[in-house]
Amino acid sequence: MPLNIAVIGLGRMGKRHVHTLLYRVPRAKVVAICTTEPSEIEWAQTNPEYTEFNIAVYDDYDKMLASQTNLQAVWVSTSTDVHAIQSLKAIEKGLHVLCEKPISTDLDEAQSVVTAAKSHPELKVMAGFSRRFDASYRDAAEKIQSGSIGTPFLVRSNTCDLKDETGFFVRYAARNGGIFVDCAIHDIDLTLWYMDSPIPKACWAAGSLQAHPELAENGDVDNAVGIVEFWGGKIAYFYCSRTQAHGHDVLTEITGTEGKVLVNVIPRANNVVLADKGGLRHEVQPEYWQRFEHAFATEANEFVDAVLSDKKVPVELETGITVMKIGQALQTALLSGEVVRFDGKGERVN
């Protein structure tokens, strides 16, 4: 029997998750969607695809939880500020949860979700760190784990987005926790994965406003660099940008004692190269979805399989707590101009 799942949130991510579940996850059945945005509700109610698949449309999350008696799981893809409360309500209802990153920008709130999940071991509750499901990043992990580069000690990772001309990023900035929390969170997660969960020791950062001066009202920037020193001598360097001219550009380089692994050194939309009097050139994906569409499908399939086959979820929920601690420390360092330090147990001391 397929897993009955509801998608919460119908913004740019929610719509894509519904489509993925409908056409790329054969063991899942989308039974409902929920959004509080009137325009999204109208769009869903008049969408022939949703009618064809008999997807119920709700504008109230609590009402959906009460009405959908056969519901088994939810995929939370709303704005960050309600991730935790919606996950908690689902857990209390006895539902499995796949929650987009981050669980919350408030560490205590995020920890409450982890605690609730632990109190219900029969439920699968997973954090959505999608890059862990990308074939290239997984191949890099396998090479590192097999000892191909010796002991990894340095990660350099970028998340650079195409310059946003629509105003979406500026509007979203008030709720996303800042550029390091929103933009570098995947890079931080990859660092913990590739370097075997090192404990942070110190964070410092700097940034600038190049295209979106309005971000200053939220204490944020559109370009930033952060460095994390870990206990034991490991280091990570992150570059985040919202102003790239060429497209979505994500690069990760892991250096070890006997070599290095690089992922996506030269971003490209596909394998087409145009050769003319101007030389050789290729196009780049405009945004993250074109780069990670397959990863999101893999993530969904593995979550559904974990539920239906009673397997361990591929990404532990606790991972999100450590990632958020580092992301917030970098954001604090960015705003204060001071180094943020951690003790030997990974707890902040300033």
Q: What is each residue range found by the language model?
A:
Residues 1-51, 191:
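N-terminal Rossmann-like dinucleotide-binding module
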Residues 36-40, 245, 289-301, 315, ...:
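Active-site loop of classical SDR/Rossmann-like NAD(P)-dependent oxidoreductases
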Residues 94, 121-122, 147, 233, ...:
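Glycine-centered short loops/turns at secondary-structure junctions
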Residues 189-269, 297-313, 343-350:
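Contiguous beta-strand/loop segments that form the cofactor/metal-binding neighborhood of enzyme cores
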